[in-house]
Design a protein with these regions (language model features):
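Short acidic/glycine-enriched loop/turn segments that link adjacent beta-strands
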Residues: 65-69
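Short capping segments at the starts of secondary-structure elements
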Residues: 10-19, 24, 28-31, 71-76
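Intrinsically disordered, low-complexity serine/threonine- and proline-rich regulatory segments
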Residues: 1, 76-79
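Positively charged, polyanion-binding regions of nucleic-acid-associated proteins
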Residues: 1-17, 45, 51-54
Length: 79
């Protein structure tokens, strides 16, 4: 799942909410994106994966609209 999430963020032109990423993940995995229960579950799982990647320094988060977090890749300087 983390691989797909990072791939989604690599292709993003702007930061995405956790829910946006979960929706794109459902499409990538060819799952029913209209299933609200599945979307809520995947949003939680994506959030857990993103927090783990934030702790590793791979992604950054910032407060977005309402209680939503916006996520983007952390750009590392290669020396």
């Amino acid at each position: 799942m983390t691989r797909i999430i990072l791939s989604i963020l690599r292709q993003a032109a702007e930061p995405f909410t956790t829910r946006d990423i979960a929706l794109l993940l459902l499409v990538e995995r060819r799952l029913d994106r209209n299933d609200q229960r599945l979307l809520r579950l995947m949003t939680k799982r994506v959030g857990v994966a993103l927090r783990g990647q934030r702790e590793k320094g791979a992604v950054w988060s910032e407060h977005g609209p309402g209680q939503h977090m916006l996520w983007r890749l952390a750009h590392r300087k290669i020396v």
